[in-house]
């Protein structure tokens, strides 16, 4: 047996990784081409757009993985938490624990070459997830009670992430191949590209910034500088002229916000 082929190597392949997210990004081109070839009814493509924009990008990434699991900006009911778990994990980028570890390092070592997992430090090519960096706890230790809590609750999903995604994808296939293709594979793959682009755009000029178009760009969180300045704030719109679309969308889940980290004296 080759030295690299070991139980430890197999275990690593089951966890979230760059190769799996990159596979999602590459596969989506073939999936779109096949979807066009199938010549399905128009509403399947409407479903694709909805699942890309709302289910995976807004709910899965922005609200679930980022605001809820990583930062704990609010609490929700049990059923909503499981909905968040599914919509976030099925994107292909990772689950609560891996996402939070990556994001914690991103905040702590923002724009530090060789350490910040994503953004301009890895170049424009990092829009393709393969060229982002994976977090190495030995190099950048993470000391966080919140991360420990995520590990205790969702460690099983971290260890068996790829089987979880593939099993759920298989269930969607059994329901209907078009559900699998148009409501998961295509929109989730596009979401991977969109998120890869967003984390690069949010750090133009090698520093976090607020997008001047944030009021119109409601899919990706545009007030990124505000988020870095006040990471515990549930609402990144800290000025009267700003709007945090992710915060506004999250209200449909009737969350209980933790306002302790919200600034109240920010001037224009």
Regions found by a protein language model. Name each.
Residues 1-197, 233-268:
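Non-catalytic, topology-defining segments of multipass membrane proteins
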Residues 198-244:
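Glycine/small-residue-rich hydrophobic helix-like segments
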């Amino acid at each position: 047996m080759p030295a690299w082929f070991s139980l430890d190597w197999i275990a690593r392949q089951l966890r979230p990784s760059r190769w799996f997210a990159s596979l999602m990004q590459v596969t989506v081109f073939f999936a779109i081409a096949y979807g066009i070839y199938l010549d399905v009814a128009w509403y399947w493509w409407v479903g694709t757009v909805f699942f890309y924009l709302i289910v995976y990008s807004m709910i899965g990434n922005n609200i679930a993985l980022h605001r809820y699991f990583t930062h704990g900006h609010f609490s929700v009911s049990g059923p909503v938490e499981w909905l968040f778990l599914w919509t976030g994990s099925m994107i292909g980028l990772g689950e609560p624990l891996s996402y939070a570890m990556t994001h914690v390092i991103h905040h702590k070592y923002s724009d530090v070459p060789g350490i910040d997992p994503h953004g301009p430090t890895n170049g424009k090519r990092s829009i393709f997830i393969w060229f982002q960096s994976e977090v190495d706890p030995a190099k950048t230790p993470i000391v966080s009670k919140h991360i420990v809590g995520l590990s205790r609750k969702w460690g099983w999903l971290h260890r068996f992430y790829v089987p979880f995604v593939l099993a759920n994808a298989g269930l969607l296939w059994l329901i209907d191949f078009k559900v699998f293709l148009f409501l998961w594979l295509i929109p989730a793959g596009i979401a991977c590209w969109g998120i890869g682009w967003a984390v690069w755009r949010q750090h133009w000029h090698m520093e976090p910034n607020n997008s001047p178009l944030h009021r119109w760009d409601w899919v990706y969180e545009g007030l990124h500088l505000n988020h870095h300045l006040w990471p515990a704030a549930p609402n990144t719109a800290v000025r009267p002229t700003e709007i945090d679309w992710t915060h506004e969308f999250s209200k449909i889940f009737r969350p209980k916000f933790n306002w302790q980290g919200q600034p109240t004296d920010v001037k224009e």
